[in-house]
């Protein structure tokens, strides 16, 4: 492609996003779809917001949520997250559990939630891993677990 003047040499059929999505488990697809759309909208709004300071409340909420999403995706080098933790964190974001946590505290909150799930909710994580999709039972357990974590989390 590069030698044919197509620069950058990106083949849509081999694109990482297309191949990556095909390799994801259904649970990841269930929570990631909405997040992808929100991130795209956030990037558009963030670019637009640079030119104007008078933003309505809805736009401000979208920008805040987008900032939280970006922070949630940050992780230290050589510290991969298991697929079941990724699903749980994205589900928590999608279901507004991070909305009242400041952007600066999102990293701490996500690490705290991950520790909570890994040390006390192994059965739930195993269900996500083995069923590979979010059904009503898993969503109910996620809601219960994340609500319990949220009641104890202190964003100091």
Regions found by a protein language model. Name each.
Residues 1-156:
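Conserved catalytic/coupling modules of large nucleotide/cofactor-utilizing molecular machines
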């Amino acid at each position: 492609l590069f030698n044919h003047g197509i620069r950058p040499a990106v083949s849509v059929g081999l694109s990482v996003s297309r191949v990556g999505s095909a390799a994801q488990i259904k649970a990841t697809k269930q929570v990631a779809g909405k997040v992808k759309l929100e991130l795209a909208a956030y990037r558009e709004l963030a670019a637009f917001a640079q030119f104007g300071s008078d933003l309505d409340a809805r736009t401000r909420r979208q920008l805040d949520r987008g900032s939280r999403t970006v922070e949630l995706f940050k992780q230290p080098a050589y510290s991969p997250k298991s697929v079941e933790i990724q699903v749980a964190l994205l589900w928590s974001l999608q279901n507004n559990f991070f909305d009242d946590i400041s952007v600066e505290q999102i990293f701490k909150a996500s690490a705290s939630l991950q520790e909570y799930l890994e040390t006390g909710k192994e059965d739930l994580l195993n269900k996500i891993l083995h069923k590979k999709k979010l059904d009503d039972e898993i969503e109910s357990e996620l809601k219960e677990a994340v609500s319990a974590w949220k009641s104890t989390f202190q964003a100091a």
